Amino acid sequence: MFVKLLMLVIFFSVMIIVGIYSRKSVKDVNGFVLGGRSVGPWLTAFAYGTSYFSAVVFVGYAGQFGWKYGLSSTWIGIGNALIGSLLAWVLLGRRTRVMTHHLEAKTMPEFFGKRYQSSGLRLISSLIVFIFLIPYTASLYSWLSSLFGMAFNFDYKWCVIIMALLTAVYVILGGYMATAINDFIQGIIMLVGIVCVIIAVLNGQGGFMQAITKLSDIPVDAKNTASALLNMKGPFISFLGPDPKNLLGVIILTSLGTLGLPQMVQKFYAIKSEKAVKTGTIVSTLFAIVISCGCYFLGGFGRLFDSPLIYGANGAVKYDTIIPTMLATLPDVLIGIVVVLVLSASMSTLSSLVLTSSSTFTLDFLKA
C-alpha cells in the first residue's frame, strides 16, 4: 500500500509543480486558452493522444470489446490510430491552424461565429459544447472509481474530489501550457505503463503462446457471435473475431468522433507552426498505435479471467470490472503503475475537457 500511495503523491506533486512553472506563460487570454499559440509538435501530439485515450478506453472499452471480440478488438486500436489520429491530423491539422490563426479564434464556437459571421451560431455551438461535455466528464469519474476501489478501497466521492481539485489547481495556475506539459508527462507514463501491464498479465498466464492456447479453447459465445459463425473454432483468437460486422461499426464509431470533438480539435489551434503539424502527425499516430492497440490487445485476454466477480445480480457481465479483475493479482508496484497510468489517462482528458468547456462558456456564452 505504501508503494502505491508514494507513487500517487509523486504524481500529484509533479502535476502541481508543472502548473506553477507554466504560470509564466499565462500573460493574457490567448496565453491561458492556447498557450500563446507556441506549443511544439511533441507536446501537441501527446496532448491530442492523451485527450483521446482516457480511463474510459482502458477500463471500459478495452474490457467490453475485448470480452466480445477477443484479440480481434485490436483492430479498434488500429482504426483509432489511422482514422482517429492520422486522418484527423492530415485533414484538420494544417487547415485548422491556419484558419484559426487568421481569424484569431480561440475556441471552436468562436471560429464558427467568425467564419460564418453568425453570433447565433457561436452562441448555440457554445451551449452544445458546454452541455454535452458534462456527461463525458462524469463518465471519467465513473470508470476511475472501479480501479481506485480495487487499489486503495477509496470511497468514490473522495476520488472525485481529489481529481477535481488537482485538475482545477494546475489548469487555473498554468492554463493550456500546464495542460500540454502535464499531458506529455502523463503520455510517457501511459506508454511505459501499458507495456508493463501487458507483459505482467501475459506472464501470469504462462507467456504469450500459453495465453493464446487457453484463449483458443474458449467456445463461441452465442450472444456476441454472428449467426453464420456460431460453429467456428477459436473465435477469440481469429483474425476478425466472432462478429466482424459489429466490430467494424465499433471501429467507425470510436474513430470518426475525433474529427468533431472540440477538446481535441483545439490542439491544432495552439500548435506553433505548419511545419510542426507534420511532426505532430507522425508522433500522434505512433502514440495512438501503442496506447490504443495495447489497451484493446490486453482486453482481448479478458475471458481468461472469467469469474463470478465480473457478473451482476442479473447474470449480465459488468464490463467495467473485467480489466480491474485482470489486474487484481498483480504486485503492489505494478498496481501502482496501473493506477498512475489510468489516472494519467483520466487527468489529461479531464483537464482538456475542463479547459475547453470553461473557455467556451466564458468567451463564447457569457462574453458574447
Task: Please report, for each region that a protein language model flagged, where it lies by residue.
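Membrane-interface "cap" regions at the ends of multi-pass membrane proteins
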Residues: 1-60, 174
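Alpha-helical transmembrane segments of multipass membrane proteins
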Residues: 7, 11-18, 84-88, 170, ...
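Helix-loop-helix module between adjacent transmembrane segments
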Residues: 15, 76-171, 250-257, 344-352
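Hydrophobic alpha-helical segments and their helix-loop junctions in multi-pass secondary transporters
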Residues: 18-25, 133, 137-141, 149-162, ...
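Membrane-interface helix-loop-helix modules in multi-pass membrane proteins
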Residues: 33-104, 245-257, 264-266, 270-308, ...
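Membrane-interfacial loop-to-helix junctions in multi-pass transporters
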Residues: 39-42, 116-123, 152-161, 240-244, ...
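Small-residue-rich segments of transmembrane alpha-helices in multi-pass membrane proteins
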Residues: 39-48, 113-118, 186-200, 286-288
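Membrane-water interface regions at transmembrane-helix termini and the short interhelical loops
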Residues: 67-69, 92-95, 146-150, 165-186, ...
